[in-house]
């Protein structure tokens, strides 16, 4: 069954109200608001997609300095929001009955969430409310191997990963990547190391019978379809090698 990975609206996940060019104008009063999360995202997504809902991702946009200095408050807000989401899924609204395999995931755009004093608390919040961490392969974040320790804190659990922007382009490199890679018909910046790490996580997750949901952007390597094909081929090759080595 084809499953969709759906990202929550900025109304809920961006701490700032932004102008047309993306510049922050003022604080967003709806940031991580529990009611908005359920009413504007979780419920309509599940009611619209049903069993095709794979993962609902709350991608927290880059935080301004005053929020980065108040990370415990951010985590408390996140906890309250995820609690409301879980209540909507499993409580009186019973939304999960329409999408029994849906995964709730949180993605971030600040390495501060991976700090030694913050990461354990983030993992605790996610575990408490039945959510997982979405691996964010993006130039704003550390490479995949630096994010895996957080995923290990949640193990065993489903995998959600979004490959967005090759690290070579820097934190604001979307337009540069688009200009370089169009018409997105070939891989121009292969990232075999990331692919190898991701392959291992996919196989370990699937071996536990858990969902492994991965999306890849054209700006990750140059061509999303070819990146997906290369990842699938590596997964298949590792499986074939393991089958060859196993006793008959």
PLM regions: where:
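Residues lining hydrophobic/aromatic ligand-binding pockets adjacent to catalytic sites
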Residues: 1-248
């Amino acid at each position: 069954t084809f499953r969709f990975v759906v990202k929550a609206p900025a109304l809920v996940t961006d701490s700032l109200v932004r102008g047309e060019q993306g510049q922050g104008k003022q604080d967003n009063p709806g940031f991580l608001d529990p009611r908005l999360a359920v009413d504007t995202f979780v419920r309509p997504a599940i009611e619209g997609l049903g069993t095709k809902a794979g993962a609902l991702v709350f991608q927290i946009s880059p935080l301004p300095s005053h929020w980065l200095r108040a990370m415990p408050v951010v985590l408390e807000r996140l906890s309250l929001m995820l609690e409301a989401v879980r209540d909507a899924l499993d409580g009186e609204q019973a939304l999960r009955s329409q999408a029994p395999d849906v995964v709730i995931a949180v993605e971030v755009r600040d390495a501060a969430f991976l700090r030694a004093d913050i990461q354990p608390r983030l993992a605790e919040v996610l575990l408490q409310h039945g959510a997982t961490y979405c691996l964010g392969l993006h130039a704003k974040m550390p490479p995949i191997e630096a994010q895996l320790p957080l995923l290990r804190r949640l193990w065993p659990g489903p995998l959600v990963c979004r490959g967005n922007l090759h690290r070579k382009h820097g934190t604001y490199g979307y337009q540069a990547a688009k200009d370089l890679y169009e018409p997105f018909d070939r891989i121009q910046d292969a990232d075999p190391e990331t692919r190898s790490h991701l392959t291992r996580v996919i196989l370990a997750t699937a071996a536990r019978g858990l969902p492994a949901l991965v999306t890849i952007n054209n700006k990750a390597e140059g061509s999303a379809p070819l990146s997906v094909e290369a990842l699938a081929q590596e997964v298949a090759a590792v499986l074939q090698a393991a089958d060859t080595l196993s006793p008959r």
